[in-house]
Amino acid sequence: MKNRKIWVMLVGLFTALTNGFMGTTLTFAEENEASQTIEQPSYISDFPNQVGHWQDLVGTAEKKNDSAGLWIANTKQGTNLESVSINLDAREQSSGDLELTFLYEGQSNFGLVFRGDKQKTSQWQSFAYNRDGRWQLGQPGGKWLTNIPGPTLLSGQQYKLLVRYDGKKIQTFLNDQLFYENEEVHYPDGTSINDDWMGAVGIRLFGNLSKLNIISMKSGPVGSIPVIDSSAEYRELKEKWRNQLVSKEYDSTNQALVDYVQKISNEATELDQTMNKEPNRSYLWPLEPGNTPSADLTTQFTKLQKLALAYGTKGSTLYQDDKLAATIIDGLDFMVTQKGYDGKKYHGNWWDWQIGVPQKFLNILMILEDKVSPEKQQIYTNALSSYVPDPFKQLYTKPQGTFVDLAFIPNFVTSGANRTDLALTVLGLGILQKDSGKINQASSSIVDVFKLVTKGDGFYQDGSFIQHNNIPYTGSYGNVLVKGVGQILAITADSSFQMDATLVTEFVENVDRAFLPLIYKGEMLPTVNGRSISRAPAVGKTGYGSTTMYNLLIVAKFAPNNYQKKFQEAVKYWMKENPDYYLTNARDFNDLQMTMQLLTNPEITGGQLPFTGTKLYASMDRFVQRTPSYMFGLGLYSKRTASFEAGNKENKRGWHTGDGMMYVYNDDEVQFNSSYWPTVDPYRLPGTTVDTISLADEVSAFTTITSKEQWVGGVTSDNQAVVGMALNKDGTKNNGKLLPMNLQAKKSWFVLNGQIIALGAGIKGDTEASIETVVDNRLLNDAYQYQVLSNIGEIHEKNETSKKQWLLLKSDHSNANMGYYFPEETTVNVKSETRKGTYKAINEAFPSDKEYVGDYRTFTIQHGQHPTNEHYAYVVLPGIDETDLKTYAAKKTVEVLSNTEEIQAVKQEEEGYLGVNIWSETGGTIAGITSNKAISLMRKTQQHQKTYTFSDPTQTTKTLTLKIPKDYSTVISQSDGITYDDATETFTINFENAAGSSKQIIVE
């Protein structure tokens, strides 16, 4: 037998050579010999090298080849558009296998031809794709089955279509999945398929002009083209998805697991008891206060999912309860047939129909497994596929409660977190429908969302993350994106669908740059949470932190080893501060399991602060500094980045959160927490220079406001930085109405370890209210005792104004003090105020009537109603005590070299620090440094070496020239794009495409 196999292989090779690689065709004797061992295709195309020989039976088709394969396109002949082309290189046969591998690009009406008679134009049979998941089978003479349901092809995907025709039996497979089988094909006219025709194979195009890219074509005897059974892989993918949600294991000695399961069980029991099970019901559970009709859909499916979680989680009192499973399925039927989630119509917010409901729906189907019949699953997945046909299409938002036909936004492609949400649904559908095309599309579609961008939505080189075109959104939309991408990569890992390792690493690197510097005690800084800051939190923490922790652990699962350990160490550091919170706030079993494993893993210590130093996110106008004792953040805006976002009646008073708002965290435990946003004075946010004129709550559809100014940015190096913003409120709108606001100012922050030096200059504007700079506005911790001390003594009055050299908000708790030093004596107003508020007042989409109370100490500098060239200077000293503050003030270590609207500069000799912001487009000179254009610069002196770090904060300069004091003999190093002219002692810096990033010169 072994010799016979070798002989067959040699004959096959000889035949291929004599055919000139048109494709391999075996003789009858060779085929018979081969069949005694294993059936093989008798024809395999070689389209990249040869078009081959073709005959057009019907119409005319143009054919050409290139490295991508064969291209075939029908042409119009009179009124006829149909072409039937048979391949003369393939053997004629009456029964056999015919396989076509092709790239689908949105075409309709194309397919395979078999049993084609070379002499008769009306004797051939075809299996073809029409469109939208509809297929057809038949032959000329009106013998057609034209509405065969099957997979919907997705544009951009490669497919393998196999038709197995054996007598009157037809089977068709797409990517090895059987989707049509008919033991004896009968046509509507009562006749059956002709099974005695001996004929050729080929391609049919009809109904419209189209062009098809065929990668390969094979034909041979029945069974010669193997069908790979991938059902086991789909089961594994489904099990991975299911294991993220529920567990079939239970350990009664694990208290965290016991508590988690008990919580699920209790919630489900209550929901089961309160569910409306009447035969003529109009709802499952009553409409919740504040819910719109479309939001109610998401709520109803969320509750059904909670029932499913209890059903699928071992240890629950409802585990594997058949009655509960029937109740859930009955509820799904009700939502599809009675509440309109049937894939045909919709109303209200697109998000509920395409994201809110589908993810819960899919989770339920994954958990219930075979409790859902194949017939019902097909109904459910067909409905889901109608709302989410692919990850790219988004529905319009329509009026609530009035059903309309599905209306996808034309010429629109989803981006960012919305793309990943939709991709996750497509992945789930692909798993349930065993559709490799959908799974591949889900994976390929998310690559765009983590590829670096230079404008619009997505990740930037510096770690910025933008959503809605110009809103910093790392904390909310960014988290959603990371969760979605993370789940897709985790589920498809170690399968035939896994993403290329290089792309996975790119994603992980983006997560590293974007997230770790923006986390304080496990929570994302509010300055990157967008309108989400106005949402009522769950009991305890805001939830953004826990979400980030769990998402980082998901990413760690598939991250390269070095990043895996880095993320796990970081998460453990933050989780150790409050482990019970993370164990009791898990979103699903996967979160709990990852948390338990991490906290009990002795090899991961979590002993080091994950990020220290400074980080400028120039592409989203955000800055952070992290030291072991405090964290400092800045929220800015420019022509590139919006000042805030309001929409869906959320964040109605976020007007000034981008006006230079300072976030200083120390150990007071309450700053910017759940009681802050409903109670803080929205006109007096810390760090801002503001026109306090009353504004109406933002209730228009979506509000974003950009500045006319481009000068926003700075430089960073280790734990030092220089940051600036040209503030310009001209053009500000309120609910779409242009305001007469005209406030302008130049604001700078010079950042050192333990010192934040704030300068303001060129403050001008007109208002009927007052223009103020808010030195700080601190929420006090009710559990601490506070005093307001100053160089003129303790301040007891609720409202006090006087000239001051320093102020101290003193606490009885370690590292909760805040000190303020004024380089020149400054009139400062000190206000003690108790404020009350609710989240409902600032957010109607996520309302809460709970009243919060906040006790505040506000320090402001008044500039009057018509300032023309006002200025300010102060230093924030987090955690300083009274003795050290007095010493600091007496030493006068901060030297303000310039505080004008042309140049702001600060020198701190002890730290070897010089910071400069030159605002003028034509540059300027300060401290022996001359630039011919606007620049942000920092000089750090260490012994005999000076390091100059600088950037173009306008992000518009192509080149500038820079001269520095000639107190050096050697240029040790300089960044790429810098040249030095010895004759003029001038550096020329190329900032093209720098996007606000820094360059550096080191001299000695």
UniProtKB/Swiss-Prot annotation:
GO MF, one example: hyaluronate lyase activity
InterPro entries found in the cross-reference section: Chondroitin_lyas, Gal_mutarotase_sf_dom, GH-type_carb-bd, Lyase_8, Lyase_8-like_C, Lyase_8_alpha_N, Lyase_8_C, Lyase_8_central_dom
Statement: the UniProt record of this protein carries the keyword Ribosomal protein: no
Signal sequence range: 1-29
An annotated GO cellular component: extracellular region
Keywords: Lyase, Secreted, Signal, Virulence
This enzyme's EC code(s): 4.2.2.1, 4.2.2.5
SUPFAM superfamilies: Chondroitin AC/alginate lyase (SSF48230), Galactose mutarotase-like (SSF74650), Hyaluronate lyase-like, C-terminal domain (SSF49863)
Pfam families from the UniProt entry: Lyase_8 (PF02278), Lyase_8_C (PF02884), Lyase_8_N (PF08124)
Active site (UniProt): H468, Y477, R531
GO biological process, one term: carbohydrate metabolic process
Induction profile: Expression is up-regulated by 5 kDa hyaluronic acid (HA) in vancomycin-resistant strain V587 cultured in human urine.
Disruption phenotype: Deletion of the gene in vancomycin-resistant strain V587 leads to significant defect in kidney colonization in the mouse model of catheter-associated urinary tract infection (CAUTI). Double deletion of hylA and hylB genes in the same strain leads to a significant colonization defect in both the kidneys and the spleen in the mouse model of bacteremia.
Localization, UniProt: Secreted
Catalysed reactions, as listed in the record: [hyaluronan](n) = n 3-(4-deoxy-beta-D-gluc-4-enuronosyl)-N-acetyl-D-glucosamine + H2O; Eliminative degradation of polysaccharides containing 1,4-beta-D-hexosaminyl and 1,3-beta-D-glucuronosyl linkages to disaccharides containing 4-deoxy-beta-D-gluc-4-enuronosyl groups
Domain of life: Bacteria
UniProt family annotation: Belongs to the polysaccharide lyase 8 family.
PANTHER family attached to this UniProt entry: HYALURONATE LYASE
Function: Degrades hyaluronic acid (HA) and chondroitin sulfate (CS) A in vitro. Is not active against heparin sodium salt (HS). Involved in the pathogenesis of vancomycin-resistant E.faecalis infections. Contributes to attenuation of the lipopolysaccharide (LPS)-mediated nuclear factor (NF)-kappa-B activation assayed in the mouse RAW-Blue reporter macrophages.
Name recorded for this polypeptide: Hyaluronate lyase HylB
Organism: Enterococcus faecalis (strain ATCC 700802 / V583)
